[in-house]
Amino acid sequence: MNASSRNVFDTLIRVLTESMFKHLRKWVVTRFFGHSRQRARLVSKDGRCNIEFGNVEAQSRFIFFVDIWTTVLDLKWRYKMTIFITAFLGSWFFFGLLWYAVAYIHKDLPEFHPSANHTPCVENINGLTSAFLFSLETQVTIGYGFRCVTEQCATAIFLLIFQSILGVIINSFMCGAILAKISRPKKRAKTITFSKNAVISKRGGKLCLLIRVANLRKSLLIGSHIYGKLLKTTVTPEGETIILDQININFVVDAGNENLFFISPLTIYHVIDHNSPFFHMAAETLLQQDFELVVFLDGTVESTSATCQVRTSYVPEEVLWGYRFAPIVSKTKEGKYRVDFHNFSKTVEVETPHCAMCLYNEKDVRARMKRGYDNPNFILSEVNETDDTKM
């Protein structure tokens, strides 16, 4: 190996070693110290609310059982399937015990040695196992025909009617809960995605905060409406500290903020003017701010007519000042419009004023210079000739 090849090899080894060390250090910092450095947020990127209720009284907890339908729908799948299986197995075994008790009280079991002309309440129940099988056949209406109720016992007839009615109720409730869980519009909201970052740049001569949102399905959202809430800690003039103070943020598209034609990805924007809470922020102080921007998208699912809401949030580290989104819509040779989701969250750096106040002050200066004066306090007054000023 000559000297030049050895130098190239040494350089390659050094670059690879530095790269591996850099990634290892980044992983260690993220793994062991990242959680302490992360900013707390109320709404996660996928729309889940990070909130915990403490010291809830027992009476308040009982309300969840009063509204049992919503409680069952909100349960996780593992708990729901546990309740589903337990409800059926428990009811079958419970009524199996009742059928066994009826046969035991009426002395229909073989251990009582019934006579040849003895008519049992239920034919062919010889023990707890056969009683359980009869309960199963009755509730799910299998009807094999080997075991059946006779007209000998009114108790058995009443128990048969009661189990049949209760079985229909259990079937309706549990199957309805499973179907409602599957068809909830919350799953449709998973196919609506927001850009990873929000950007701040000029648009139409105004400084705007822009966010990109896309519908991954071809079916539309009817009557879509988009808006935002800025959550921050504020102190009132009376000295009260409000931890999660909510400030309305108006987002618009070129056509407005309601009834969006959501067939392709949209770039929504908020104009940073004198009424915007972002007006006094600057590129240098953005990361020092303590706020969370929560964005909501409400709409009606076209296929099911169910109303759904999609939400996400952005913290200061996820707002890029001086960037805009890269184009993602193009036209093919066949005349179709193609959306490239590879560039969905990709941003491009552009020249942007470092604060909104600077942009509007610059516009005021240009307007004054265009009118012929640059002193905002200068007032042109009419002067009349007097006897002292006449020549």
UniProtKB/Swiss-Prot annotation:
Q: Where are the residues of the annotated region Polyphosphoinositide (PIP2)-binding?
A: 180-207
Spell out the reaction equation it catalyses. Answer: K(+)(in) = K(+)(out)
**Listed transmembrane segments:** 78-102, 156-177
How is this chain modified after translation? Phosphorylation at Ser-44 by SGK1 is necessary for its expression at the cell membrane.
- Site feature: Role in the control of polyamine-mediated channel gating and in the blocking by intracellular magnesium: 171
What is its subcellular localisation?
Cell membrane
What highest taxon heads this organism's lineage?
Eukaryota
Going by the UniProt record, its keywords in alphabetical order are: ATP-binding, Bartter syndrome, Cell membrane, Disease variant, Glycoprotein, Ion channel, Ion transport, Membrane, Nucleotide-binding, Phosphoprotein, Potassium, Potassium transport, Transmembrane, Transmembrane helix, Transport, Voltage-gated channel
What InterPro entries does this protein map onto? Ig_E-set, IRK_C, K_chnl_inward-rec_Kir, K_chnl_inward-rec_Kir1.1, K_chnl_inward-rec_Kir_cyto, Kir_TM
Activity regulation reads:
Inhibited by WNK3. Activated by phosphatidylinositol 4,5 biphosphate (PtdIns(4,5)P2).
**Could you state one GO cellular component term attached to this entry?**
monoatomic ion channel complex
GO molecular function, one example?
ATP-activated inward rectifier potassium channel activity
Q: Could you give a single Gene Ontology term from the biological process aspect?
A: circulatory system development
Keyword Transmembrane carried by entry = yes
Q: Which residues lie within the membrane without crossing it?
A: 128-139, 140-146
Per the UniProt entry, the glycosylated residues are: 117
What protein family is recorded? Belongs to the inward rectifier-type potassium channel (TC 1.A.2.1) family. KCNJ1 subfamily.
* Disease connection: Bartter syndrome 2, antenatal: A form of Bartter syndrome, an autosomal recessive disorder characterized by impaired salt reabsorption in the thick ascending loop of Henle with pronounced salt wasting, hypokalemic metabolic alkalosis, and varying degrees of hypercalciuria. BARTS2 is a life-threatening condition beginning in utero, with marked fetal polyuria that leads to polyhydramnios and premature delivery. Another hallmark is a marked hypercalciuria and, as a secondary consequence, the development of nephrocalcinosis and osteopenia.
Designated name of the protein: ATP-sensitive inward rectifier potassium channel 1
Q: What is the lineage of its organism?
A: Eukaryota, Metazoa, Chordata, Craniata, Vertebrata
